[in-house]
Structure formats: C-alpha cells, structure tokens
C-alpha cells in the first residue's frame, strides 16, 4: 500500500468577519477534516487587512478559495456549502479517486 499522500495548500480569501466569511471557513474546515485529514495547509487571508495579497493573487470577490498546490492552481468564488462542487471545482475529488485507485493496484 502506498503511504505517501499529497499535501494540499489552500488559501481562503475573506472580507472581514462577516457571516459569509465565517460560514465559508466553517464549511471548508469541515470538508477538509472529513476528506483530507492532516494532509492540507489552509491559510485564511482577510482582504480588508491585506489588500496587497488579494491584488497579487488577482482576487476580485470573496469568499474565494484557491488550491495552490499541487498544480494547477484552481479557484472557487462564492458559496462553498456544496462539498462535491468544492472538491470537483478544485480538482480534489478527482485526485483522491486517482490516489485510491492506484492504492488498489498493489
């Protein structure tokens, strides 16, 4: 069995401590803990406190979730409440299916 697992680096861009920001973070943490236990790094960036980071990463709306690693970079803007849409939108669901299939090949 292959014990190596990818580590996912994600950035969540929010605008302050608004209900949408809080909901997006809570939903995302639930998804990540269920699907990627311990194999992810999540950085939350408040664009009101760090507008230069939003500008550098070309963030135009919040909440925005970006998968930075592994490549390619993928972004989801807006509602993060649909687990499957989040995973598919970031190519995370496909990666996990591929990893599980390759583990079964042994």
From Swiss-Prot:
The keyword Transport does not apply. It comes from the Bacteria. Keywords: Biological rhythms. One of its GO terms (biological process) is circadian rhythm. NCBIfam families: circ_KaiB, PRK09301.1. Has 2 forms, fold switches to a thioredoxin-like fold (KaiB(fs)) when bound to KaiC. Key component of the KaiABC oscillator complex, which constitutes the main circadian regulator in cyanobacteria. Complex composition changes during the circadian cycle to control KaiC phosphorylation. KaiA stimulates KaiC autophosphorylation, while KaiB sequesters KaiA, leading to KaiC autodephosphorylation. Phospho-Ser-431 KaiC accumulation triggers binding of KaiB to form the KaiB(6):KaiC(6) complex, leading to changes in output regulators CikA and SasA. KaiB switches to a thioredoxin-like fold (KaiB(fs)) when bound to KaiC. A metamorphic protein which reversibly switches between an inactive tetrameric fold and a rare, thioredoxin-like monomeric fold (KaiB(fs)). KaiB(fs) binds phospho-KaiC, KaiA and CikA. KaiA and CikA compete for binding to KaiB(fs), and KaiB(fs) and SasA compete for binding to KaiC, thus the clock oscillator and output signal pathway are tightly coupled. HAMAP family: KaiB (MF_01835). Belongs to the KaiB family. The KaiABC complex composition changes during the circadian cycle to control KaiC phosphorylation. Complexes KaiC(6), KaiA(2-4):KaiC(6), KaiB(6):KaiC(6) and KaiC(6):KaiB(6):KaiA(12) are among the most important forms, many form cooperatively. Undergoes a major conformational rearrangment; in the free state forms homotetramers as a dimer of dimers. When bound to the CI domain of KaiC switches to a monomeric thioredoxin-fold (KaiB(fs)). KaiB(fs) binds CikA, leading it to dephosphorylate phospho-RpaA. This is Circadian clock oscillator protein KaiB. It comes from Gloeothece citriformis (strain PCC 7424). The lineage of its organism: Bacteria, Bacillati, Cyanobacteriota, Cyanophyceae, Oscillatoriophycideae. The gene is kaiB.
């Amino acid at each position: 069995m292959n014990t190596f697992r990818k580590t996912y680096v994600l950035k969540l861009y929010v605008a302050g401590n608004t209900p949408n920001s809080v909901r997006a973070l809570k939903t995302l943490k639930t998804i990540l803990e269920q699907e990627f236990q311990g194999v992810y790094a999540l950085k939350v960036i408040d664009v009101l406190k760090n507008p230069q980071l939003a500008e550098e990463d070309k963030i135009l709306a919040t909440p925005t979730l970006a998968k930075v690693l592994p490549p390619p970079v993928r972004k989801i803007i807006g509602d993060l409440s649909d687990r499957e849409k989040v995973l598919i939108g970031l190519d995370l669901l496909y990666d996990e299916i591929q990893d599980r299939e390759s583990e079964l090949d042994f």
